[in-house]
Every structure is written in structure tokens, then in C-alpha cells.
Amino acid sequence: MSRYLLPLSALGTVAGAAVLLKDYVTGGACPSKATIPGKTVIVTGANTGIGKQTALELARRGGNIILACRDMEKCEAAAKDIRGETLNHHVNARHLDLASLKSIREFAAKIIEEEERVDILINNAGVMRCPHWTTEDGFEMQFGVNHLGHFLLTNLLLDKLKASAPSRIINLSSLAHVAGHIDFDDLNWQTRKYNTKAAYCQSKLAIVLFTKELSRRLQGSGVTVNALHPGVARTELGRHTGIHGSTFSSTTLGPIFWLLVKSPELAAQPSTYLAVAEELADVSGKYFDGLKQKAPAPEAEDEEVARRLWAESARLVGLEAPSVREQPLPR
């Protein structure tokens, strides 16, 4: 029997080391134990993946959670799941289609009318590397949903967020933003040959630029805004890439994926952290990679690009009277 002890001990050591390495590489659990009783939280794209897990985490902490999703059947099912698991009955589903400016305006109008406050807005929903689709209003899908939809939604809810201050806005970006570039001559991919990867990277860079500019405009308001990269997660977001479902991925790359790819539960920890951590109460305009604050790509910190993107985004979504007043941009 003793001859098996050494191999078993070695195997256990290796397995333990692998688990510790995975925890180190993929981040870890939200270090904050703060609760949010009585606070109203909106999570977009919360019917599945990171969004659902984020809503679950915040429901456990006592929040009044609003799941904002396009597919109401899935959204209602997710809300029911979360209520059952957390015994928090203040979890509700609302319809929001970020590919429709009309839907965004209708959603915001109902929130403003029916909700006493909005303490936390988590712009989680996203589209990744889809075919060359367009939104209801004719925008390239990834730029339209990932950036423009959340840009409009956030601006429409700013007065409610300011009235609820201190409040927080969390924008989910991606490490892919470092490969992005804002092409002001063709934001909508009307003249260039469509490149779904480049379009995705552009949309994620736009989110970080939006975060930076919004933070500047919100100084002194009691509302903070930060962007984050949640990590690579095994969710429906990557369904258009095909990589998670391929035989090559599941066999040859299996060990690497196990090490680097997060579960939705783990990928929801950064959003949870930015939403509740007391030590982040006054942190704004920053970019987080997982649970750690890091410098974004150089273009993401270009103030002139951020101002120009804001002005163009406002024009595209018809935001004639932004909630946050600003001096005219220099010509």
C-alpha cells in the first residue's frame, strides 16, 4: 500500500498546484463582503452568462435587481432562477433591446417613471464577432449594441443616477480594446470590407473612451463610472467564434482553456467588486483587468478622441440634449 502513497501524494500536489495556478491566472472571488440592501441595480444582458451571475451575486447581497434583456422568456426564467436561489424576491425582468433606440428609450422612460432610484447600472450586454449584421436603426451590430446602445441608455438614466448618488456605472469592455481603433471616417463599416474582429475591438475601445469622457463630465456629481475586462469566459457571447465548441479546442487546447477560461461565476466577480466595494467609492474613469486597476491602451486615454467620439455618438443616437452639460467642442 505504501508504494502508492508517494505517487498519490505527488498527484495531489500537482492537482492542488494546478488549482492554485488557475485561481491566480483567472483572478478570484470578489474580496468585498459589502451588502447593498435597498439599492436598485440594473444589469443589461442578464438572462445568461456573466450578466446572470452578476445579478445573482448582487441579489445575494440584498439588492433590488432589474434584469434588462431582449429575450423576455429567457429573462423571466433567469429572474425566477435567481429568486429561487437567493430567496430575494426583489428580482424582476424588464424588456430591453439594445439594437433598437426605440426600445432603449421606452425602457429608460419606464425606469424613470416606476423606480424611485437607480444606484448601480451595469452595462453588461454585448455582441461578439457576429456576421455583418445591423441594428434596427442601421448601425453595425457590435458598435450599435456594445457602445451606442449603452451610451444612450446611460445618458437617459443619468438624472436618476445623480438623484440616487452616490451611485455607480460599470461598463464591460474587453482586453480586445487594445487592438481597437476608432475610425471616424467609417464607424459604421460602410466603405471598408467588413472585419468582424476589428469591429468588435473598435466597439470595446469605444466603451473605454466613453467611460473616460463620462467620468470627466460627472466630476462632483456623486456618480462614478469605470470600465472592466471580466476575463475570458465560457459563455454564449463567443458563440459566433466557434472556438469553444470545436473538437480541436476541446481536446488539444483543453488544458489551456481550463487554465485560462473562467466560468461565468468567476467572470462575474469583477463586476460585483466594482459595484459594491467600499474602497472604490471615489474611484472613477478607471479601467480594471479583473479585480485589478490597470492602464488601458494609449488610444483609450486620448481625451480628444474621447470628446469627438462622444459628440459623434450623441449625434448618431439623436441625443440632442445630453443629461450632462458640456462646453462646445473646439473646432
Curated annotation (Swiss-Prot):
Pathway annotation: Cofactor metabolism; retinol metabolism
Alphabetized SUPFAM superfamilies for the sequence: NAD(P)-binding Rossmann-fold domains
Residues that hold substrate according to the record: S174
Chief site of localization: mitochondrion
GO MF, one annotated term: all-trans-retinol dehydrogenase (NADP+) activity
Disulfide bonding pattern of the chain: none
Pfam families registered for this protein in UniProt: adh_short
Originating organism: Homo sapiens
Family: Belongs to the short-chain dehydrogenases/reductases (SDR) family.
Protein name: Retinol dehydrogenase 13
Modification N-acetylserine occurs at: S2
Biological process terms in GO annotation: eye photoreceptor cell development; response to high light intensity; retina layer formation; retinal metabolic process
UniProtKB keywords: Acetylation, Lipid metabolism, Membrane, Mitochondrion, Mitochondrion inner membrane, NADP, Oxidoreductase, Phosphoprotein
Function: Retinol dehydrogenase with a clear preference for NADP. Oxidizes all-trans-retinol, but seems to reduce all-trans-retinal with much higher efficiency. Has no activity toward steroids.
EC number: 1.1.1.300
UniProt tissue specificity: Widely expressed. In the retina, detected in the inner segment of the photoreceptor cells. Weak signals are observed in a small population of inner nuclear neurons and the inner plexiform layer.
Enzyme class: oxidoreductase
Residues given in the record as NADP(+) binding sites: G45, A46, N47, T48, G49, I50, G51
UniProt xrefs under InterPro entries: NAD(P)-bd_dom_sf (IPR036291), Sc_DH/Rdtase_CS (IPR020904), SDR_fam (IPR002347)
One GO term describing the cellular component: mitochondrial inner membrane
Residues bearing the modification Phosphoserine: S323
